[in-house]
């Protein structure tokens, strides 16, 4: 029997589905852009969605690390979507917050507003922090990554090699 497959994450987290159904496969279109010739299995899987006019880059990783990576990349005409705890780092940029790091319900409520608000702005690029994939984070991250056309920078620290 083929396990169930999550095509588009939403308000019911993957963990809740798995608690009832057992293992649930996550379709690759949830985490990456479909290649030319690949057919989407559900509406909204293939194309950029909810994308502002300015190009978006999503920075993944621990919140502190992703904030530092954004700080390293931003310029005076950049926009930033970040967690509330890091908004003060970006005093020279236009900033819209997702909410507190630990409150994915608030982040889910604010993600589209943060993206859309930049359409009335003169920013030339947007950098966005991304929550981890636990709980609603999978859906929030999916929406941010789709808006970015899956232009994602891994802000995770490289592993240390022990000799």
Question: Where are the predicted features?
Answer:
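Active-site-adjacent structural elements in enzyme catalytic cores
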Residues: 1-163
């Amino acid at each position: 029997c083929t396990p169930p497959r999550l095509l588009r994450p939403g308000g019911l987290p993957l963990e809740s589905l798995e608690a009832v159904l057992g293992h649930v496969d996550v379709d690759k279109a949830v985490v990456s852009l479909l290649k030319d010739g690949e057919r989407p299995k559900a509406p909204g899987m293939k194309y950029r969605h909810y994308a502002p006019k300015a190009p978006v880059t999503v920075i993944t990783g621990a919140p502190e690390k992703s904030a530092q990576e954004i700080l390293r990349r931003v310029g005076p005409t950049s926009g930033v979507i970040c967690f509330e705890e890091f908004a003060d780092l970006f005093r020279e940029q236009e900033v819209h917050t997702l909410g507190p790091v630990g409150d994915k319900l608030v982040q889910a409520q604010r993600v589209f507003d943060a993206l859309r608000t930049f359409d009335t702005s003169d920013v030339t690029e947007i950098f966005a922090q991304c929550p981890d994939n636990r709980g609603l984070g999978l859906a929030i991250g999916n929406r941010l990554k789709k808006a970015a056309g899956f232009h994602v920078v891994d802000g995770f620290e490289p592993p240390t090699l022990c000799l």
